[in-house]
Amino acid sequence: MTTETLSLIKSSIKSIPDYPKKGILFRDVTSLLEDAQAYQATIQLLVEKYKDMGFTKVVGTEARGFLFGAPLALELGVGFVPVRKPGKLPRQTVAQSYELEYGTDTLEIHVDAIKPGDKVLVVDDLLATGGTIEATTKLIRQLGGEVEHAAFVINLPEIGGDKRLEGLGLQVYSICEFEGH
């Protein structure tokens, strides 16, 4: 990745102070999507990183993980599997709950979306605490999939999600990092 490409991607991500609550500096990846050159560069970096690793599925988490996971899956020539909030998937699902700052949330995946032995790459827009990807990883493994890699556009390393996911045996890759929360 050239410094020019990294600069293009990083500068396209807007920072919104005090959103969704006071004291948070929100990294808005939707501004990257508005810039076709930055969006394409992001997908191409992910393709270059993962093109020869033998993945059979790409899993993206709701909702912004879909925006990076689906085009990556197309470029890699593999299927894309969405992981969604409860009640959003039409076929039979399995669910995994996980802890939030205040309470819990749940994610679901179709029971037939991952086959035993599938080699899965998990993709999301941003890594903060790692809770969403930990739950996603548990779902994939419950269905017999092999998941050892997780890719993100943005990592907020001070929050520690990368360490949490490494503790699950995942190799974590992010295109860019930002300080703070």
From Swiss-Prot:
Pathway entry: Purine metabolism; AMP biosynthesis via salvage pathway; AMP from adenine: step 1/1
Q: What class of enzyme is it?
A: transferase
Any idea of its EC number? 2.4.2.7
GO biological process assignments: adenine salvage; AMP salvage; purine ribonucleoside salvage
Q: Which reaction does it catalyse?
A: AMP + diphosphate = 5-phospho-alpha-D-ribose 1-diphosphate + adenine
Q: Which Gene3D superfamilies match?
A: 3.40.50.2020
Q: Name one GO cellular component term.
A: cytoplasm
Q: Which CDD domains match?
A: PRTases_typeI
Could you tell me which Pfam families the record lists for this protein? Pribosyltran (PF00156)
Q: Does the keyword Cytoplasm apply?
A: yes
**InterPro entries according to UniProt:** Ade_phspho_trans (IPR005764), PRibTrfase_dom (IPR000836), PRTase-like (IPR029057), UPRTase/APRTase (IPR050054)
State the SUPFAM superfamilies in the record: PRTase-like
Subcellular location(s) per record: Cytoplasm
**Primary place of residence?**
cytoplasm
Q: Looking at the record's lineage, which domain of life comes first?
A: Bacteria
- Please describe what this protein does: Catalyzes a salvage reaction resulting in the formation of AMP, that is energically less costly than de novo synthesis.
Share what the entry says about its subunit structure, partners included: Homodimer.
The protein's name is Adenine phosphoribosyltransferase
Q: Which gene encodes it?
A: apt
